[in-house]
C-alpha cells in the first residue's frame, strides 16, 4: 500500500526552533530563517516547504506569536519581524528597540515569551532584562491594529507565560514564581 509517511530536511543547516499554524500552513522557524510548510497530502508530494526569510531566525521557542494571519517574532539579532502569508518577511521599526537589545540578559533569549491581547490588537514580548536578573521582568509591546497601530510600549512586569482571552474571559499571565494574574480586567 502507498504511504504518505515522509521526512523533509530543511536545507541550509541550523536547527528548528519553533513552528506556528497560520491558516492551513505551518510557519517553521530555524535559528537562521523562516519557512512556510504547505500540506498537499499526495503520494510523492505530501508537504512543500518554501524559505520565505533569511537572517530572521527565531531567538527562542516562545518568541513568536500569530495574530490573525500575521506572525510576529524576535530574531536572533534582537530585531522584531512580521510575516503575513503570501508576503515577505518585514523588519518592524521600533524606536525603543535599543533599550531592549542592549539589556536583554545575555544567553537568555530562550526565555522570551511572545503573546497577544487580541481585543486591543497588541502583541507583546516578555523578556529577561539584565538590569533585573535572569528571569522575565520586562515587556515591550506593539499595537498592530486600531488607532494606535505602530505604537510601541514598554514596562516592568514579570511574566514567563501568557495566554490571550479565549480559554478564559481575560488574558492571563504567570510570574516565574507561578502566580497567575488576570490582565485587562
What do these predicted ranges mean?
Residues 11-185:
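Beta-sheet-dominated scaffold domains
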